[in-house]
Amino acid sequence: MPLTMSQAFIGNFLGNSPKWYKIAILSFLIINPILFFYVSPFVAGWVLVLEFIFTLAMALKCYPLQPGGLLAIEAVAIGMTSANQVLHEIEANLEVLLLLVFMVAGIYFMKQLLLFAFTKIITKVRSKILVSLMFCLTSAFLSAFLDALTVIAVIIAVAVGFYAIYHKVASGKDFSAVHDHTSESNTQLNNSELESFRGFLRNLLMHAGVGTALGGVCTMVGEPQNLIIAAQANWQFGEFVVRMSPVTVPVLIAGILTCLLVEKFRIFGYGAKLPDAVHKILCDYAAHEDAHRTNKDKMKLVIQVLVGVWLIAGLALHLASVGLVGLSVIILTTAFNGITDEHALGKAFEEALPFTALLAVFFAVVAVIIDQHLFAPVIQWALSYEGNTQLVIFYIANGLLSMVSDNVFVGTVYINEVKAALIDGQITRDQFDLLAVAINTGTNLPSVATPNGQAAFLFLLTSALAPLIRLSYGRMVWMALPYTIVLSVVGVLAIETGFLEQATQYFYDSHMIIHHSAKDVIAPLTSH
């Protein structure tokens, strides 16, 4: 029996999403205008934010761009915000969008080098604790200079590569054979071996994911919101690192200890060992690759190392904006490694562009938050406190919201509100700088709790790898729990005990950083 037009509409709407999810989104689209026009724009605004958070939480049911985008389009259409305000938010965060477009694509052309490095870690080091630690620390180091999303994209590529190699060989084929590693129907695979390998990959990906948060919070390029906060505070790369260090250094040490402990005691789903048979396959593959590596291939690796040095130097010395450094990485790696085919270049942009579009939708929701003054009561309440208590409240408020909502727009909203308070004369410039540290660390550290908070975690959850290694939303939350508790508590203690304030004063006295004036914040605003 042919489908009716209404059945066809529901069938097409949001594709393969569950029917209840489709009905929920359609209900949201009907409810929002009623709330906005007949109840209260403030209530409608908060409902929209909660609905948007719901679409992020349900990322495995449907990629959030479409449902979130429909909610954002309707918000503009009914007057919750304007298209101009959305454009203004995107303009203000253009560097973040450029970072996602160019930096992620640039690192795509350096994957060979990173695959080479991570393959060596797994094949040469047999201790699971040591491998976990190396993945965590390597991710932390890379995330300090690259966007966390980029680092996770690389680790995903590494894990997919390992999974595909094992699946191919275990299915009775050789390394060069064409094979569909997503197929579940192969009877030759050893199920217990496959499950152990999946557990091992899940462990490494979660350690690496948390590593990106540990390293990402330290520098202005580590996470998209860091760049936004640094721009509002008018800090350069070095100053950002110094100002964050009283919180980020103790947190990094605590994170490393957590990595060791969860592996040692095999708790929260950690401690899965790499089966010997799988290790042998990966070692054979590494030996096969080494034996067949030509001088041309070796030269490509050398070029990628040199471009990596330029990348770190360019960012550390702030020689150009982050996005432009990323563009230079694309040009240098492709030019010297002979990648000139348009289709080969296009593949590099496939990973990041859907998320870049989703980020533009985030900024539409930020525009609603700003226009409807949704956060004003929270901000005013927090500013009514003084000293370390005020900093702790901002840290916790950012942290709680970042656990359930994307930390990019949480950080953006809070720094904008605090900047407005500075311009109104409610706080001093030194207080603003301390609050910027509390906001940055608050959005970055507790947000590892769920995939909603960390863009890198959401990217991992929505990747093609997640179903292959059975990494669900609930499992990610459970595995992130020990890190969430430790990182959040250590961050709070670093602020609450006065260590942040005392260390910052020491940095001023040692002339490592300087006192800024409020004009540094107001000037860019008025010149916009």
Curated annotation (Swiss-Prot):
A GO MF term: sodium:proton antiporter activity
Location of the protein in the cell: Cell inner membrane
Transmembrane domains' residue ranges:
10-30, 63-83, 96-116, 131-165, 204-224, 240-260, 305-325, 359-379, 391-411, 449-469, 476-496
The source's superkingdom equals Bacteria
Recite the UniProt keywords alphabetically.
Antiport, Cell inner membrane, Cell membrane, Ion transport, Membrane, Sodium, Sodium transport, Transmembrane, Transmembrane helix, Transport
Q: Which reaction does it catalyse?
A: 2 Na(+)(in) + 3 H(+)(out) = 2 Na(+)(out) + 3 H(+)(in)
Where in the chain are disulfide-linked cysteines found? none
Q: Which GO terms describe its cellular component?
A: plasma membrane
Query: Its topology with respect to the membrane?
Result: Multi-pass membrane protein
Which family, according to UniProt?
Answer: Belongs to the NhaB Na(+)/H(+) (TC 2.A.34) antiporter family.
Relate the protein's function as given in its record. Na(+)/H(+) antiporter that extrudes sodium in exchange for external protons.
Q: What is this protein called?
A: Na(+)/H(+) antiporter NhaB
